[in-house]
A protein has these predicted regions:
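Hydrophobic alpha-helical segments within soluble ligand-binding/sensing domains
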Residues: 1-3, 14-18, 137-145, 166-173
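Extracellular/periplasmic Venus flytrap/periplasmic-binding protein
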Residues: 1-90
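Surface-exposed patches in mature extracellular/periplasmic domains of secreted proteins
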Residues: 2-7, 31-33, 107-109, 161-163, ...
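Active-site proximal loops enriched in glycine and acidic residues that flank catalytic Cys/His/Asp
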Residues: 6, 87, 111-114, 135, ...
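Extracellular/periplasmic periplasmic-binding protein-like sensory domains
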Residues: 24, 43-62, 78-80, 96-168, ...
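N-terminal post-signal-peptidase region of extra-cytosolic proteins
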Residues: 69, 94-97
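Segments of small-molecule ligand-sensing domains
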Residues: 152-221
Length: 223
């Protein structure tokens, strides 16, 4: 069972819908779909969707019935196995630390690639430790000479880096399309990820890599 937490925007809605469709198709259960905005109290949103407010309400009702104060530690809902987060780096840096405040630091968080700026920033991203996200190998390869040269020349953002990767792989793929379509099992390992042809639709499919924030740095996950 999962909670989806997405921004209150057109992109956030699309990301949330895509996750919901996939999750349910895979047999998952979505227990909450929450949308946050710039004016939304993130604390209130998390407290409500994690049912911490309900725990506090039960305590208050019990105190009222007994007529005395009780020692009490609020509890979050126990039917959540994962949290899907669609967020920018700035949004995620606000939201992720609050999970611990609401007793949910043990819930695995899986995010969209938008959570990572594309450039190492351990002091800013330390609050994201533990979050896993999928991305293209190009974004994680800080030692790639071509990537660094393009980045330095264009002062590239993460979005620009992704567009550059698309252009580079498109060029090389144009020379390998016949091979991809004639040999169904062919896999092209590009900087976008593993590219192959779907046997039914003939569309090109891309398999990205997984990364996790460890010590404020985005590091590849082996499996």
């Amino acid at each position: 069972s999962a909670i989806a937490l997405v921004p209150d925007s057109e992109w956030g809605y699309r990301a949330g819908e895509a996750f919901t469709d996939f999750w349910i198709a895979e047999g998952g259960n979505l227990v909450s779909f929450a949308r946050y905005g710039d004016s939304t109290s993130h604390a209130d949103l998390l407290e409500s969707n994690l049912h911490v407010d309900a725990s506090i309400a039960r305590k208050n009702a019990l105190q009222g019935n007994l007529g005395r104060a009780l020692e009490f530690t609020p509890r979050r809902r126990q039917d959540v196995d994962a949290l899907f987060l669609a967020a920018s780096p700035q949004q995620a840096r606000q939201l992720k630390p609050m999970l611990a405040f609401f007793f949910a630091e043990d819930i695995p968080v899986y995010a969209t690639s938008s959570i990572y700026s594309g450039f190492p920033d351990p002091s800013a991203d330390r609050d994201l430790d533990g979050v896993k996200f999928s991305t293209m190998p190009w974004i994680l390869n800080n030692d790639n000479e071509l990537r660094n040269n393009l980045s330095n020349q264009t002062n590239a953002s993460a979005t620009a880096l992704r567009m550059q990767a698309l252009g580079i792989d498109s060029f090389y793929l144009s020379q390998r399309l016949i091979q991809l379509y004639e040999a169904p099992d062919t896999i092209y390992r590009g900087i976008l990820g593993k590219l192959s042809k779907d046997s039914q639709s003939n569309d090109l499919e891309r398999e990205q890599v997984w990364a996790q924030f460890i010590g404020g740095l985005a590091r590849p996950v082996n499996n």
